[in-house]
């Protein structure tokens, strides 16, 4: 298992393909699996790898919560597609002599046990929620205006990046390009969200992270279902 060399374009492409239908490296919540892979990536993936970039920006936002993310961090080769071998160069040996602080926490045995317990609790809660299937789920229909930088922005790529955002309780709908003047068109895209899982702040944060294509995002219409 692995992603190849995550410091190379080829390795980042493998990561991007792997995340095309996943929000996280493992499971349904950010975990130490995401931390391990995040640490191996030397920086933000390029904008054309929109799945990898969306994941990178999302995991980066958990920097303050890194110690409490569930799971036990394993070797990088334990994650990713089964048919790819990990060849990412590790800086673990060299970094022992440095004064740099590890971006994502320690391998403390006690902390790992606590993290494992926390992960099992969260998974149990998730399975419990799934099994209960509440009779009424509050949902909203949202129409978003996503504006590009100029008339040279690749709108097909912009829409691909937007639709790459996946979350439990989020379903993308129809879209169209609407002229705004000077040859510029904005993307108008519909989505349905479960109110207790997905909010407009989260959507705005993840959409505007694709800043090579996206200038801004506005909520054009918001209706309870």
Swiss-Prot record:
Feature: compositional bias, Acidic residues: 96-113
Pfam families from the UniProt entry: EF-1_beta_acid (PF10587), EF1_GNE (PF00736)
PTM: Phosphorylation affects the GDP/GTP exchange rate.
Key words of the record: Acetylation, Elongation factor, Isopeptide bond, Phosphoprotein, Protein biosynthesis, Ubl conjugation
PANTHER family cross-referenced by the UniProt entry: EF-HAND AND COILED-COIL DOMAIN-CONTAINING FAMILY MEMBER, ELONGATION FACTOR 1-BETA
Disulfide feature: none
Gene that produces this protein: EEF1B
Oligomeric form and interacting partners: EF-1 is composed of 4 subunits: alpha, beta (alpha subunit of the eEF1B subcomplex), delta (beta subunit of the eEF1B subcomplex), and gamma (gamma subunit of the eEF1B subcomplex). Interacts with elongation factor EEF1A1.
Residues the record lists as Phosphothreonine modifications: 88, 93
Sequence segments annotated as region (Disordered): 78-115
Record organism: Bos taurus
Single Gene Ontology MF annotation: translation elongation factor activity
Position of the Glycyl lysine isopeptide (Lys-Gly) (interchain with G-Cter in SUMO2) cross-link: 147
Domain GST C-terminal: 2-90
SMART domains the record matches: EF-1_beta_acid (SM01182), EF1_GNE (SM00888)
A GO cellular component entry from the record: cytosol
Protein known as: Elongation factor 1-beta
């Amino acid at each position: 298992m692995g992603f190849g060399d995550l410091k190379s374009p080829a390795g980042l492409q493998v990561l991007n393909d792997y995340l095309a239908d996943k929000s996280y490296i493992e499971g349904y919540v950010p975990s130490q699996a995401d931390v391990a892979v995040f640490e191996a990536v030397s920086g933000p993936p390029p904008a054309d790898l929109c799945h990898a970039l969306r994941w990178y920006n999302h995991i980066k936002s958990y920097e303050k919560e890194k110690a409490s993310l569930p799971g036990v961090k394993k070797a990088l080769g334990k994650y990713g597609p089964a048919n790819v071998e990990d060849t990412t160069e590790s800086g673990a040996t060299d970094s022992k002599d440095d004064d740099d602080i590890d971006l994502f926490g320690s391998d403390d045995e006690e902390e790992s046990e606590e993290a494992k317990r926390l992960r099992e609790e969260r998974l149990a809660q998730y399975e419990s929620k799934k099994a209960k299937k509440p009779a009424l789920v509050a949902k909203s229909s949202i129409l978003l205006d996503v504006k590009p930088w100029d008339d040279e922005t690749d709108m097909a790529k912009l829409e691909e990046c937007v639709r790459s955002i996946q979350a439990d309780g989020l379903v993308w709908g129809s879209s169209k390009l609407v002229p705004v003047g000077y040859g510029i068109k904005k993307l108008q895209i519909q989505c349905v969200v479960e109110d207790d899982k997905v909010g407009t702040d989260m959507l705005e944060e993840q959409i505007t992270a694709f800043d090579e294509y996206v200038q801004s995002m506005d909520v054009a219409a918001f209706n309870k279902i």
